[in-house]
């Protein structure tokens, strides 16, 4: 389990959350129903900020390639993403198709 309280990358999660959501909505990749389902899933996850960990980890990976964030931030958000995925799958809230969609 990653230590959510000490994770240095969680500050960037808050900054990226709205930008990533808007980008996906503008590209037509996510409709209102998917946004609502993901929000309900993440509401049940004990994180210190309300975010989209899977999308954010992908966003961080792109930023790392551009030299904007360090590898520790990316690694921490990958741990956060894995924790979210495992908890959501274990609770039966997210099927393989939804998980695959959130990775894109």
From Swiss-Prot:
It comes from the Eukaryota. InterPro entries: Bifun_inhib/LTP/seed_sf. Glycosylated. GO terms for cellular component: protein-containing complex. One of its GO terms (molecular function) is chitin binding. Keywords: Antimicrobial, Chitin-binding, Fungicide, Glycoprotein. This is Chitin-binding protein 2. It comes from Moringa oleifera. The lineage of its organism: Eukaryota, Viridiplantae, Streptophyta, Embryophyta, Tracheophyta.
